[in-house]
């Protein structure tokens, strides 16, 4: 409690606005980093390995795989489970469903990033405002002094001016850097989701894309033989 009062004295009128910006930055970064950790627990290789052990023409295997993926927390698993749950629909309808789902995920990934960027812009301005207010207080102290001007007369005003500037920059740097890094992560994750869902959609049609960009097509006769 004493440290909070000390910070209020050091930051002056800009203390609570800077406290609020700092708290919002910490909460948004923590929530976004938690989302990042959830998405880092699975790769496309795990999805492909599971699909290789399943026939796209076997409804029972598809239902089991859908249930298995739906029980997982990573967003990539949930996206594949959503697509597998619509395996009985035409390819175009599955693409529409995947497009809607991807839009929702993009909105979720980018939520809070604009607010982080806004905090990164506002915080230095709040610090600058605190600097101006601190200088005003300093000049008031100088004007009220009848004798010689000593460093003690200037200390309070200059202290508020410097502290608010430093606090604003300390909040702005992680806010802006975090917003930019999380935006890059969101774009990379969305590209990964789109690629995986396209792969699964082709797999449901009996086509498999290999690492060398070649396609393997499973004909209905081959699928029937495999199921038997």
From Swiss-Prot:
InterPro entries: ExbB/TolQ_transport, MotA_ExbB_proton_chnl. It is a multi-pass membrane protein. The accessory proteins ExbB and ExbD seem to form a complex with TonB. This is Biopolymer transport protein exbB1. Belongs to the ExbB/TolQ family. Signal peptide: none annotated. Involved in the TonB-dependent energy-dependent transport of various receptor-bound substrates. Protects ExbD from proteolytic degradation and functionally stabilizes TonB. Keywords: Cell inner membrane, Cell membrane, Membrane, Protein transport, Transmembrane, Transmembrane helix, Transport. Pfam families: MotA_ExbB. The chain crosses the membrane at residues 11-31, 116-136, 158-178. It is found in: Cell inner membrane. It comes from Vibrio cholerae serotype O1 (strain ATCC 39315 / El Tor Inaba N16961). GO terms for cellular component: plasma membrane. It comes from the Bacteria. The gene is exbB1. One of its GO terms (biological process) is protein import.
């Amino acid at each position: 409690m004493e440290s909070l009062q000390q910070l209020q004295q050091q930051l002056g009128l800009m203390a609570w606005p800077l406290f609020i910006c700092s708290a919002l930055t910490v909460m948004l970064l923590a929530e976004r980093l938690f989302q990042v950790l959830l998405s880092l627990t699975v790769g496309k290789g795990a999805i492909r390995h599971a699909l290789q052990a399943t026939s796209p023409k076997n409804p029972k295997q598809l239902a089991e795989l859908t249930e298995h993926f739906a029980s997982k927390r990573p967003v990539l698993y949930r996206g594949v489970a959503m697509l597998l749950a619509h395996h009985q629909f035409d390819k175009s309808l599955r693409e529409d469903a995947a497009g809607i789902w991807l839009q929702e995920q993009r909105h979720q990934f980018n939520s809070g990033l604009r607010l982080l960027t806004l905090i990164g812009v506002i915080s230095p301005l709040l610090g600058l405002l605190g600097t101006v207010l601190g200088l005003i207080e300093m000049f008031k102290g100088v004007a009220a002094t009848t004798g010689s001007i000593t460093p003690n007369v200037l200390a309070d005003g200059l202290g508020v001016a410097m502290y608010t500037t430093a606090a604003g920059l300390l909040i702005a740097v992680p806010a802006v850097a975090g917003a930019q890094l999380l935006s890059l992560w969101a774009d990379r994750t969305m590209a990964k989701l789109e690629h995986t869902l396209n792969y699964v959609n082709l797999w449901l049609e009996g086509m498999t894309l290999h690492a060398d960009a070649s396609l393997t097509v499973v004909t209905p006769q081959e699928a029937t033989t495999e199921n038997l």
